[in-house]
A protein has these predicted regions:
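Pol beta-like nucleotidyltransferase catalytic core
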Residues: 1-233, 239-246, 250-358
C-alpha cells in the first residue's frame, strides 16, 4: 500500500472539501490518500512517511477576486517554494475548465517559474462526479409518456446556451435561420439581448431575468425535459484535442432524454468508450466523425431538421432500455470510480516521472 499526502488547497481560497470528496471516489486498491486543506496544519503530519506529497493550487475562476492582490501572489510563491523544498509536487487545479479554456483564459497562476506542475482539467471525470455527488439523493419525476398515460410533447428541442463562444453562435444562428427552433425551448443568456426561458420552464426557485452567470448551471428541473423531445447539447468546446464533458450532457442523461451533441470531435465515441450508449441506431450520428467545424454544424442542422419530422413516440418506445442504461450507468458508483481512478493515476504518474527526471 502506497501512502499519498495531498494539501488540497495551498492558499485555502477554493473548494478544497469538494476536491477531497472527488478524490474519495477513487477505488485504486493500492493507494491511500490523506488530505488537509489547511497549510497551517502541516506540522501535524509525519510528511516523511509518505510515498508522494502533492499540493493543489486552486485556479477556480472565482478566485480572480483575490489573485490580483500582490500580497496573495507573494504568499503563494513563499508557500510553493517551501513546499517544493520538502518534496511536494504541484497540481494546478482547474477541473471546472478544459485545456482549451485554460490556454485561452486569464487564469492565475498560469505556471510558477522553476516549478514543474500538472494541469488538472475537467476531462470526463470531474463533471460526471460533481453531478453524481450533487444529485445522487435527489428525487426527480422525469417522464416522457406522462407516467404511462399518453405520449405528448409540446416542443421539439431543448437547447440551452449561456456564454457566447464562436462555435455556439454559429450553430445558434444557423438553427434560427433554418427555422429549426420554431417550436423549441432555447436560451442564450449572455447575448446583448438575452434569450431566456419562461418561468414555466426555468428553475422554480429562480426568476428567468435573475439567472446568474455562475452557480446554478448544475441544477436541474423536470419540466423542460418533459415538454421536449430532444436536447441539443451545446458543449463548451468543439476542438479535436481533448473531450471535455460538462453538466450539459449529464442533465439529459439524468432526465433520460434523447440528445444530439455539438462538442469536441469524437465526443459521442468517448461517451460510448466510458460505458454509455448513443442513438446511432435511430438517427444519423455521423456528425460526430466530422472534424471540419463548419461541416459539423451543417450536419447537426440537417439532422435536427430531419428530427422535426420523425415519429418521436416510436423513438421513445424503442429507446427505453438505452435511456435507462445511460441513467443507471451515470449513477453507477463503480463505473464513475473507474474514471476518477484515471485522473488520480495521472497525478501519480506525474509525481513518479518528476522524481525520475529530477
Amino acid at each position: 500500500m502506497q501512502r499519498n499526502f495531498i494539501l488540497t488547497d495551498v492558499m485555502k481560497t477554493g473548494a478544497h472539501q469538494t476536491y477531497e470528496r472527488f478524490l474519495d471516489a477513487h477505488s485504486l486498491p493500492d493507494q491511500k490518500m490523506d488530505y488537509t486543506g489547511e497549510y497551517y496544519t502541516l506540522h501535524n503530519y509525519d510528511l516523511d512517511a509518505y510515498d508522494r506529497k502533492f499540493a493543489f493550487i486552486d485556479r477556480t475562476i472565482v478566485n480572480d477576486r483575490v489573485c490580483a492582490n500582490p500580497e496573495y501572489q507573494k504568499e503563494l510563491l513563499i508557500r510553493v517554494r517551501l513546499l517544493h523544498s520538502q518534496g511536494f509536487k504541484f497540481i494546478m487545479a482547474s477541473p471546472w475548465e478544459s485545456h482549451e479554456n485554460i490556454k485561452s483564459g486569464n487564469i492565475y497562476p498560469n505556471d510558477i517559474k522553476g516549478i514543474t506542475s500538472f494541469n488538472w482539467t475537467g476531462g470526463v471525470s470531474w463533471f460526471w462526479w460533481y453531478m453524481y455527488d450533487k444529485h445522487l439523493n435527489n428525487t426527480f419525476k422525469f417522464t416522457h409518456d406522462h407516467f404511462g398515460s399518453y405520449f405528448y410533447k409540446k416542443h421539439d428541442f431543448l437547447y440551452l446556451n449561456k456564454i457566447p463562444r464562436e462555435h455556439r453562435v454559429k450553430l445558434y444562428n444557423k438553427l434560427l435561420k433554418e427555422g429549426v427552433l420554431s417550436n423549441s425551448l432555447y436560451t442564450f443568456l449572455e447575448l446583448d439581448k438575452p434569450v431566456r426561458l419562461t418561468q414555466e420552464h426555468e428553475l422554480p426557485w429562480v426568476k428567468p431575468e435573475d439567472y446568474p452567470i455562475w452557480g446554478l448551471d448544475q441544477d436541474i428541473t423536470e419540466q423542460p425535459y418533459i415538454d421536449t423531445v430532444c436536447s441539443i447539447v451545446s458543449e463548451t468546446n468543439d476542438n479535436d484535442t481533448d473531450v471535455f464533458m460538462t453538466e450539459k450532457i449529464w442533465k439529459p442523461i439524468m432526465a433520460q432524454h434523447v440528445f444530439v451533441v455539438h462538442g469536441n470531435h469524437l465526443y459521442l465515441q468517448k461517451l460510448r468508450e466510458i460505458g454509455f450508449k448513443t442513438f446511432g441506431s435511430y438517427f444519423d450520428e455521423s456528425y460526430d466523425l466530422e472534424n471540419d467545424k463548419d461541416k459539423k454544424i451543417d450536419a447537426i442542422v440537417s439532422l435536427c431538421k430531419h428530427l422535426k419530422t420523425v415519429n418521436w413516440q416510436d423513438i421513445y418506445r424503442q429507446t427505453i432500455a438505452l435511456r435507462q442504461h445511460n441513467y443507471d450507468t451515470f449513477f453507477n458508483k463503480e463505473k464513475l470510480s473507474a474514471e476518477v481512478n484515471k485522473t488520480l493515476i495521472g497525478f501519480l504518474e506525474f509525481f513518479d516521472s518528476s522524481q525520475v527526471s529530477s
